[in-house]
Amino acid sequence: MSTKYYSGIRNKKKNAKIGEELSFASKEAYNLLRTNISFAFPDQAGGRVLGVSSACPQEGKSTTAINLAYSLADADNKVLLIDADMRRPSVCFTLELEMSPGLSNMLAGNKDVNINKGKLLEKLDIITSGDIPPNPSELIGSQKMKDFLDDCRKKYDYVIVDLPPVLSVADTLALSKYIDGVVIIVRHNNAKRRDVVETIRQLEFANAKVVGFVYNKIESKGVARYYKPTKYYKKTQ
């Protein structure tokens, strides 16, 4: 593994731009991502479960997951956003929600999961990570997690799952067999090519469907008003 990924609560304040806080160009970029995601599953019955991950930390995956979920809900889809990064949860801090009870508490059988409704949009529900467990990979790859996602498919058009970085811990690979696809976030001037290639290799070895890539944090110098800070690239076979 190329990057250490420690368990622990992040002591940070909300600083990401979310939903209506985004610039026009950023909103359009997420709308384009939303459209491409819909094309990735044209004939699938039931709700789609899509993971958002990266090769390494600090690529912007959590912010992308939140804004993708927002964009999908804004287009009149019923959407559930799940923070499944149990080691370094981010969604609760970004959206100023209580961390627990959340996903880990439900999977461990301690409490019912708390679904946050209407925080951003009426059609967007949010489940936070819950308390940091001693065994995240076991919980996230469990039969109980599969059953939970199968139930979510019946209630939502899309389930967006914020996942840990692939090369840091085994959690994303453990969950990959239960979801329909993974979008990989690649931050400009941050991710190394070899790490992205290794991420794809590991996901494909786990029989995960890599739907595409989001190239994030592109510099706007010299770019006119049509500049988009996020670009989507569909994976080609």
Which residue stretches match the model-derived regions?
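C-terminal lobe/tail of nucleotide-utilizing enzymes
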Residues: 1-31, 36-37, 194-237
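P-loop/Walker-type NTP enzyme "switch/lid" segment
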Residues: 6-31, 35, 42-46, 54-58, ...
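Hydrophobic positions on the alpha1 helix immediately C-terminal to the Walker A/P-loop
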Residues: 63-64, 68
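Inter-motif core of Ras-like GTPase G domains
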Residues: 151-154, 168-189
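Hydrophobic residues in beta-strands of the RecA-like P-loop NTPase core, especially within AAA+ ATPase
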Residues: 160-161, 215
